[in-house]
Regions:
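Acidic, low-complexity terminal tails and accessory targeting/binding regions
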Residues: 1, 64, 68-71, 78-93, ...
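Active-site-proximal alpha-helix that buttresses catalytic centers in soluble enzyme cores
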Residues: 2-73, 98-103
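Generic beta-sheet signal
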Residues: 4, 125-136
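Histidine-centered active-site/metal-ligand motif
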Residues: 9, 134, 180-181
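Short active-site segment of divalent metal-dependent hydrolases/proteases
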Residues: 12, 137-138
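Generic structural signal for well-ordered alpha-helical scaffold segments
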Residues: 33-40, 115-123, 142
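Internal catalytic-core helix/loop-beta-alpha segment
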Residues: 96-126
Length: 185
């Protein structure tokens, strides 16, 4: 079985409704260093990351320590929104209170793509893999693994490490990452 280390990006320098692609702030950079210190003894491992700046900056610490380059995969990116920048925060707060059954078909397809991509890693490689991604993508994977239909089935903190196993096209939760109060900024 392939272990997947799902890392939520570090704290962003701006909120969801203020910047389409913020980097990390000082706290986020410190979180990324701490996460890298926790994972460093396990590697080097293959890495996959979302194309967004906050995930790239989070992954960069491990890339540097391990001397590897993460593969960018938009499938593990942020939950898609057609809302304007000003309306995104309100939209996300509303959506996160629901279930995947209540979500739009586009969001359901996004969730299915995230889950399928993560489940496929175990079919493609026997190597444990680090995936630097986002709050909702991690929840989509954990929800699929546990049969929980809520968009938010737990609250992974910034730079938390959630461990799943991928085998036979299925995901299984090994360990949930550290949880924190997450506020949509």
């Amino acid at each position: 079985m392939t272990k997947l280390f799902l890392v939520r990006h570090g704290q962003a320098a701006a909120g969801y409704d203020r910047d389409l692609d913020p980097g990390l702030d000082e706290v986020g950079r410190a979180q990324a260093e701490a996460m890298a210190s926790a994972l460093e003894p396990r590697g080097p491992l293959p890495m996959i990351m979302s194309p967004l700046r906050r995930t790239r900056e989070t992954a960069a610490v491990l890339e540097r320590r391990w001397g590897v380059t993460a593969r960018v995969d938009p499938v593990v990116g942020e939950i898609p929104s057609d809302e304007s920048l000003a309306q995104r925060g309100e939209w996300l707060r509303r959506v996160l209170q629901g279930t995947w059954a209540d979500a739009t078909p586009a969001l359901g397809s996004w969730r299915d793509s995230v889950v399928a991509a993560l489940a496929a890693i175990g079919e493609q490689t026997a190597e444990d893999t680090v995936v630097v991604t986002h709050f909702v993508a991690i929840n989509a994977a954990v929800g699929a693994a546990t049969g929980d239909d809520r968009l938010v089935c737990f609250r992974p903190g910034n730079c938390s490490i959630t461990v799943l196993e991928s085998a036979g096209g299925r995901l299984r939760v090994v360990e949930l990452g550290e949880q924190a109060v997450t506020v949509v900024r």
